[in-house]
């Protein structure tokens, strides 16, 4: 069977070149005589892998030296608890709720202190991003938390909060590595890797040095950022295969794509094709305010739920899989992450037009 176009929100597509390299090295990595999945995390081969992966991430994202990088088990959801456990030093934090995951992060933080929801776009079913310059932030907040791209509702920030003396913490799971990011605007960036980086099973956190070392003594060892970051992610056995795959994807981004500036141009061109089609007809609709439309996750609906269901079924038969929208919003969602080729978007639009003509 031919490979399909996978529009899943995550786990999602990986570059075919990366998959083929992993396939070629599956049984024996280099001269190790073993697979990366088998080797000791203390071996010289894996030591080189993890160091090279971090170094490549630092180059690709231009991460300053005063930030530490860590590879964590537990995914981004575990970070929802780690953030307040490590950073909520005043007992308070500000949260901007723009979708499901930022809401879950706020609820988790409320277990450990005051999680003040200072702005929300729930009033319009999360179809926009609040004006970050008009939000009444709390000066005694330990940090401000955002989810920079909203996978379920298909929105993204066009600018981020900048409050003097209050660090910004961002969940970038569904937009990381899709475009350049000024890391210096953030105290902490974290992301699950299964959307735009690697297979499921790991999160990466980028933390500014001055935010470390303030967790209470009763914070569990493995929930303390300092535990892993001061041991270069080797306090215990790390998610070795995910780290290896992350390294391959980063090298692909750096060498084949040419970096994040080029990746952004490619992604914006793909998204434009899909949004231009949606705006040019009336059968399919996208509810998001234009300024805040996500480049990564494009949501749309047909005239009724029955047609939505029919569309997803026929799309899957045609080789376009995982287009069903999240249960919270219904409809369809095309996640067009880095690895989705432009031809996949072009062919999806052709299929959408065919479906429209047959069902309008």
Where are the regions a protein language model picked out?
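Active-site C-terminal subdomain of aminotransferase-like
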Residues: 188, 193-275, 289, 358-360
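PLP-dependent enzyme catalytic core of the Aspartate aminotransferase-like
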Residues: 2-4, 317, 326, 330-360
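Conserved N-terminal alpha-helix of the aminotransferase class I/II PLP-enzyme fold
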Residues: 33-79, 86, 100, 108
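PLP-dependent aminotransferase-like
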Residues: 77-144
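Active-site phosphate-binding strand-loop segment of PLP-dependent enzymes
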Residues: 10, 109, 120-176
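A glycine-/small-polar-enriched, mobile loop at the entrance of the PLP active site in fold-type I
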Residues: 3-54
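Conserved PLP-binding catalytic core of the aspartate aminotransferase-like
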Residues: 284-314
């Amino acid at each position: 069977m031919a490979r399909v176009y996978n529009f899943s929100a995550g786990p999602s597509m990986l570059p075919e070149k990366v998959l083929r390299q992993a396939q070629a090295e599956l049984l024996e990595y280099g001269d190790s005589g073993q697979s990366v999945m088998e080797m000791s995390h203390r071996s010289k081969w894996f030591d080189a892998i993890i160091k090279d992966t971090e170094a490549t991430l630092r180059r690709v994202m231009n991460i300053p030296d005063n930030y530490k990088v860590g590879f964590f088990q537990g995914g981004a959801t575990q970070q929802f608890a780690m953030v307040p456990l490590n950073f909520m030093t005043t007992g308070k934090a500000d949260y901007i709720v723009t979708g499901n995951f930022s809401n879950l992060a706020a609820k988790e933080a409320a277990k450990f202190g005051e999680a003040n929801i200072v702005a929300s776009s729930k009033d319009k079913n999360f179809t926009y991003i609040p004006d970050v310059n008009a939000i009444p932030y709390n000066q005694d907040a330990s940090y401000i938390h955002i989810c920079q791209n909203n996978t379920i509702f298909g929105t993204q920030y066009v600018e981020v909060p900048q409050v003097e003396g209050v660090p910004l913490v961002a969940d970038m799971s569904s937009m990381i590595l899709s475009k350049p990011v000024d890391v210096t605007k953030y105290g902490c960036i974290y992301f699950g890797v299964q959307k735009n980086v690697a297979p499921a099973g790991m999160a990466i956190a980028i933390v500014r040095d001055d935010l470390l070392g303030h967790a209470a003594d009763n914070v569990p060892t493995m929930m303390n950022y300092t535990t892993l970051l001061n041991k270069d992610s080797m306090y215990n056995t790390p998610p070795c295969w995910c780290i290896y795959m992350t390294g391959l994807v980063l090298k692909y981004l750096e060498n084949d794509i040419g970096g994040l500036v080029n990746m952004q141009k490619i992604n914006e061109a793909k998204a434009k094709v899909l949004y231009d089609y949606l705006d040019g007809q009336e059968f399919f609709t996208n509810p998001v305010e234009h300024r805040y439309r996500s480049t990564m996750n494009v949501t749309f609906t047909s005239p009724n739920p029955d047609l939505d269901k029919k569309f997803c079924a026929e799309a899957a038969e045609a080789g376009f899989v995982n287009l069903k929208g999240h249960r919270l919003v219904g409809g369809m969602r095309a996640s067009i992450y880095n690895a989705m080729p432009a031809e996949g978007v072009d062919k999806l639009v052709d299929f959408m037009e065919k479906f429209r003509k047959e069902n309008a």
